[in-house]
Amino acid sequence: TAQPKSLDETMLIHFLQRSSEELLEGRIVQAAELLAKKEFVLFIGEGTSKVLAEFGEIYFSSIYNLSASVSHLFSHPVSKLSEETAKKVGVIALSVSGETQKVRQNIDYFIEMGIDVIAITNSEKSTIAQLSTVTIPYYITTEKSSIADVTSQLPALFLIEKLAKTVSTMLNECP
């Protein structure tokens, strides 16, 4: 049985140092520009990413706009949105692996409806990243226990907060 190792603080410190680099900062700005034009933000994720989606919903709603998370991806009627409503929605998809089947299938629905999707994932080479309008990758070492992915979610948490504050700043600067 594989057991998780102790938390590698240096990996997280390195991520935080990289977060202000031009590439990552540019992706955050690009995603924020898309979200600033939306009236509603929908968060999706499975497993620990679902917990972060719920956090994102609360955090975004507190800072700048109405948002929600989808707890049960298949039972949510995303395909029932009108074209007009779809234009007002932005999706933030959270997935460490970027390969979560339920998340991928929902992204397909969103893309088909013309909804912009922002992926926050560990690699921009993942399927979810390739499907999304904008990808914000965080590139940290993945870790699995015998039953689950136990990769740190701190980078994704940080990116959700930074993205929300960037959108808020953009909207407050507009006349």
Short names for language-model regions:
Residues T1-R27:
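HTH-adjacent hinge/linker in prokaryotic transcriptional regulators
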Residues F15-S19, L34, T166:
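Residues that form generic nucleotide/phosphate-binding pockets
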Residues R27-Q30, L171-P175:
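Active-site phosphate/pyrophosphate-binding segments
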Residues V29-A32, S82:
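Short hydrophobic/charged patches on amphipathic alpha-helices used for structural packing
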Residues A36-N172:
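Glycine-rich phosphate-binding loops that contact phosphosugars or nucleotide phosphates
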